[in-house]
């Protein structure tokens, strides 16, 4: 890369300041880089960070290092209470991105007249990091959601009837969430888009208050409007690539599968999870012939991503589904049609542990 001798500075304090901020910027980049490498397993996010760190390292000339004097730094060891509030990876990434951006701005200002190459490099890296931070945070959001998905054992799918109002739906979902359900898929086949939007908004807020995932069935527009955690698509819905382009990289995409070829296709395309079914006959999919427990056994052997057995599963039939290899199930009527959705949820969760 381009480099040049650094002209002597009449003020050694500037060299010391630049040294401190080069250390700050490179250390912050390394923190973010290591999370992208080990936490997100995203080489595409690691490469630019490593390159920027190397660029700054090559411009960290001896004259700056020789001006270092931590023993006389009046602010050495000075902390701030906000540092103790970084309790998760996202907070750490944000804090270190800000740290790098601030350090680069300081370098840019003070190096402009004495080290033009360093000043230009600092400015270029700073602007590039603004956009790169967004990509990293999107990846963090997807990683967090995928972990929640891995942990989920029971998915509640709503299927309110044409006469069911929003209040009753919300009450039943809330009872399930309070009982431990951690994944809700909103599906309404009857009703206006206005009603769907109203229900989806309330359910999304409710799920996020309970730290549960909220997925919208079919409707990418609704999912985006209510900031859902993702969408679930049937075999006749939008192709995965187009859905991902609309949703962005941070959201989850699930796909219904009814045979092995569809499961393989969903995995190859990048789906985050799949539904496997219908296992038994079900009123919600009356036109589809049950695939049976043999399909569950096939999925158990072939799936490399989280999958949920679905279709006619109740507390009575769940043990057979578990014996076939399913660790996760999705239900509709077993909870939504129950007189006591809270107890029904607890019973199903107990059978899944």
Curated annotation (Swiss-Prot):
Keyword flag Transferase: yes
Gene Ontology MF, one: thiamine-phosphate diphosphorylase activity
Coiled coil feature spans: none
One GO cellular component term: cytoplasm
Binding site for Mg(2+): 218, 237
Catalyzed chemical reaction(s): 2-[(2R,5Z)-2-carboxy-4-methylthiazol-5(2H)-ylidene]ethyl phosphate + 4-amino-2-methyl-5-(diphosphooxymethyl)pyrimidine + 2 H(+) = thiamine phosphate + CO2 + diphosphate; 2-(2-carboxy-4-methylthiazol-5-yl)ethyl phosphate + 4-amino-2-methyl-5-(diphosphooxymethyl)pyrimidine + 2 H(+) = thiamine phosphate + CO2 + diphosphate; 4-methyl-5-(2-phosphooxyethyl)-thiazole + 4-amino-2-methyl-5-(diphosphooxymethyl)pyrimidine + H(+) = thiamine phosphate + diphosphate
Cofactor(s) annotated in UniProt: Mg(2+)
Protein name: Thiamine-phosphate synthase
Name of the gene encoding the protein in the UniProt record: thiE
